[in-house]
Amino acid sequence: MTPWFLYLIRTADNKLYTGITTDVERRYQQHQSGKGAKALRGKGELTLAFSAPVGDRSLALRAEYRVKQLTKRQKERLVAEGAGFAELLSSLQTPEIKSD
């Protein structure tokens, strides 16, 4: 099973883009060359701000969704310190209990 990664890319205007991939370097190069997400095209210089392995694709999708819900301040803490990332992953791996 190929591991999936969550990554954040910083744009020239200091915005953070969140995505998932199986190959961070390849995906970053795609974004740099304008062949990645439309949201990053024409945004100037891009820098890889954060990346971390998250497991399988299902978990990666849930982690991406959760990170996209964070405030800019929380994302900046994640980039600077990895703050809360382990807890975020742990919460996503906990099986959900459905009530009848």
Curated annotation (Swiss-Prot):
Note the SS bond partners. none
Source organism superkingdom: Bacteria
> What Gene3D superfamilies has UniProt attached to this entry?
GIY-YIG endonuclease (3.40.1440.10)
Residues in domain GIY-YIG? 2-77
| SMART domains named in the record | GIYc
Give the InterPro entries listed for this entry.
GIY-YIG_endonuc (IPR000305), GIY-YIG_endonuc_sf (IPR035901), UPF0213_domain (IPR050190), UPF0213_GIY-YIG_endonuc (IPR022992)
Q: Per the record, a Pfam family?
A: GIY-YIG
Q: Which family does it belong to?
A: Belongs to the UPF0213 family.
Its protein name is UPF0213 protein YhbQ
Q: Which gene encodes it?
A: yhbQ
